[in-house]
């Protein structure tokens, strides 16, 4: 098991908050939030943060948990978001961004923090997955954030699995991002998620020469009968769909 953290980002001028999760330090996570807000705000929260000045926001720890997979952490995060995350796109209570005429880059007087930690009720995994895969308001960046842990680990692991900017969506990878159970069902669920968000992918057959580029595909083939191999397909995704928005 490893440690994960649920955090809240508050400001000193209103009661709107952002809920997030991380396996990195809160300091590093907050630093990335501020960098995204200043350089490339692409979501409700970062747009709000940039408008009102990043120095008017502060990050606080809500809960430290022991987790088996990243999905465990995000299931807990989604419950906090449902109850409190007014600046989160997923379940956020600000459907349309309304930015008041506040001065930017000026630290305002600190008000009493609105947020108090309350343990939320945990919802079923399938309910969260259904929301994630059917909610049209979730951007690709937020979709990736839901499943993929911090980028330093993400980049290292994916680079090891990548060939010519493409990655094989193996059973190991699906397990890593939180999928469980039968591999075929895992893969089919993941394909639905990709289609829902218009993310292109390929499916290789056993006679495709590209299969030779992926050691894990060759290992899979070695453990299958000829009849099963001829009917099998291997899901391939462009790595840039994960790394870049």
From Swiss-Prot:
| Transmembrane annotation, as ranges | none
Family matches, as PROSITE patterns: GIY_YIG
Q: Name the chain's protein.
A: Putative MSV199 domain-containing protein 146R
GIY-YIG domain: from which residue to which, for each copy? Answer: 2-97
- What InterPro entries does the entry give? GIY-YIG_endonuc (IPR000305), GIY-YIG_endonuc_sf (IPR035901), MSV199_dom (IPR018879)
| Taxon lineage | Viruses, Varidnaviria, Bamfordvirae, Nucleocytoviricota, Megaviricetes
Organism, per UniProt? Invertebrate iridescent virus 6
């Amino acid at each position: 098991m490893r440690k994960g953290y649920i955090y809240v980002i508050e400001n000193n001028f209103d009661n709107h908050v952002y809920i997030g999760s991380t396996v990195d330090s809160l300091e590093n996570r907050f630093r990335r939030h501020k960098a995204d807000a200043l350089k490339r705000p692409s979501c409700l929260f970062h747009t709000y943060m940039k408008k009102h000045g990043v120095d008017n926001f502060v990050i606080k720890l809500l809960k430290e948990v022991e987790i088996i997979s990243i999905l465990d952490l995000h299931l807990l995060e989604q419950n906090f978001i449902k109850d409190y995350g007014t600046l989160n796109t997923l379940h956020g209570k600000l459907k349309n961004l309304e930015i008041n005429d506040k001065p930017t880059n000026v630290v305002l007087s600190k008000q009493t923090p609105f947020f108090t930690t309350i343990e939320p009720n945990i919802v079923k995994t399938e309910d969260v997955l259904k929301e994630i895969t059917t909610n049209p308001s979730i951007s690709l960046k937020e979709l990736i954030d839901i499943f993929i842990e911090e980028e330093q680990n993400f980049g290292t692991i994916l680079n090891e699995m990548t060939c010519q900017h493409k990655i094989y969506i193996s059973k190991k990878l699906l397990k890593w991002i939180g999928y469980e159970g039968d591999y075929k069902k895992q893969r089919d669920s993941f394909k639905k998620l990709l289609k829902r968000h218009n993310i292109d992918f390929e499916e290789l057959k056993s006679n495709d020469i590209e299969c030779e580029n992926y050691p894990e595909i060759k290992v899979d083939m070695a453990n299958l009968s000829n009849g099963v191999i001829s009917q099998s397909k291997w899901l391939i995704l462009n790595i840039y769909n994960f790394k870049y928005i």
